[in-house]
């Protein structure tokens, strides 16, 4: 209690660190096999999909999201040591958040975090609860996806719904690797392209009113061997 925990996994262990308006954010991946080739161009393609400031549907904050690998990677391959990468923060406007300690934003972590961490948490930009922290998570996911693909496993996702507008759901018994690849190449991934246009219109309308709306993401994995998971 009173400790922010940002790590997941057992055999592959991911720790995400940093805060929205701190000097940097980053990720540490432990347990990666040595000798795994990582194509950094493919990693950067996924980082670009997440990066804000390029579209009205995303936050206007612009960051380069250029991960700098500090350890665990040499000559294009993993070394077996923890893979650590940092992403510098540059476009911060901390003065915009000076009133949050008195007026928490509805629907955000401001108030519960203030209570749980006794007011010592960094509230600037949401601190460690900011969407900014998805950048190192995407880096880690892009690395792990390449390793999984060499083992015949792939993972992908699409926007299932936003504010009452629904996309076509995955067929629970027939999700193809080709579909997952197509979705992972698009900035706003939907199976039904008409749904994307309607969702964008809903987001634009909320943005015009100074509001925000929620959504649901559906994820699928293919090629997982039977019996995987659990104890």
What residue ranges belong to the model's regions?
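Generic N-terminal targeting/processing segments that precede catalytic cores or assembly contacts
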Residues: 3-134, 138-231
């Amino acid at each position: 209690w009173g400790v922010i925990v940002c790590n997941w996994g057992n055999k592959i262990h991911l720790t995400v660190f940093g805060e929205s308006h701190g000097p940097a954010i980053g990720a540490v991946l432990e347990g990666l096999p040595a000798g795994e080739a990582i194509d950094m161009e493919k990693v950067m393609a996924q980082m670009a999909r997440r990066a804000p400031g390029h579209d009205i549907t995303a936050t206007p904050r612009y960051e380069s999201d250029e991960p700098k690998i500090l350890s665990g990677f040499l000559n294009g391959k993993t070394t077996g040591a923890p893979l650590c990468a940092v992403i510098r923060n540059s476009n911060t406007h901390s003065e915009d958040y000076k009133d949050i300690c008195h007026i928490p934003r509805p629907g955000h972590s401001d108030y519960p975090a203030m209570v749980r961490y006794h007011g010592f948490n960094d509230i600037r930009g949401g601190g460690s609860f900011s969407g900014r922290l998805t950048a190192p998570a995407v880096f880690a996911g892009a690395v792990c996806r390449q390793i999984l693909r060499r083992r015949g496993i792939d993972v992908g996702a699409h926007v299932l719904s936003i504010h009452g507008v629904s996309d076509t759901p995955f067929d629970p018994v027939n999700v193809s690797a080709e579909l997952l690849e197509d979705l992972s190449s698009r900035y706003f991934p939907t199976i039904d392209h008409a749904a994307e246009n309607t969702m964008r219109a809903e987001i634009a309308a909320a943005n015009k009113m100074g509001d925000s709306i929620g959504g649901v993401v559906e994820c699928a994995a293919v090629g997982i061997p039977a019996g995987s998971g659990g104890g």
